[in-house]
Amino acid sequence: ISGYIDRLPATLRQIGVLSGHLGLEMKDGLLTKLNADVELVDGMLGIPGIDRDAAFETADLVFSYSRPSDSFMVSKAALNFADQRRLSFDGAVTQFHAPSANVKGMIEANNLPIQSLLDGWPDPVAADLKQTLRQRFRGGQFKFVKAEFLGAFVPETSALTLSRLGLESRFSGVRANFASGQYKRLVATIGGALGMNVGKGGQIQDVLVDLEMTDGSMLLDGYERPVDLAYGQVKSIIRGDVATLENLALDMGSAG
């Protein structure tokens, strides 16, 4: 089927063994309309703009393609991977045959290693933020992550450029390094919630952080000995250049 959709990225052509219902129309050797409600087994997923493929065990898909309206729409996509990861998404591509197509959609994942998200992060999207996250965080897993996006896709180069990205997530087991300024050392294992909105050009519009910290250590400038941080909570909202601290609680054991 993918061979008849001439603008479909090569990364989406390894769809696996297919069963279900397909309805299609052909004209002059070209696919003009397609409606599908299918199940795929043992296939490969590749997302445009992300240079990694992932093998999946099963996938339930409901999608449609229309050459007259120049659109490709995914109403449902639910994939299960061998390592218990789950991924679902929906969305639409309009101006499908144009040099630059419009893309809008939502991706939701469970049990996703944070490193895999960083490895697949598109380079043009908030590159400075990606570098900061790599430097300050390691390990851990997203229990839940949801991203809503709007952007443009260039089939010729498989380049995906996002003009809007909204992120919601819950995670655990991340080792974090918050050292900065008077805090010569501030490390802890963190979990909690992180949300953000990123606009055109990778501009971060707002960030919501709601964290719990354990097994931490802090060393202030001018002090010789670090202080253990047994437990901590912090909730903060950042909008533009303004940061609002809504809650901060630290348990330093015998140190206070």
PLM region descriptions:
Residues 1-6, 13-29, 36-101, 106-119, ...:
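Hydrophobic lipid-interacting interfaces of membrane-associated proteins
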Residues 9, 131-135:
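Short, P/G- and charge-enriched loop/turn segments at secondary-structure junctions
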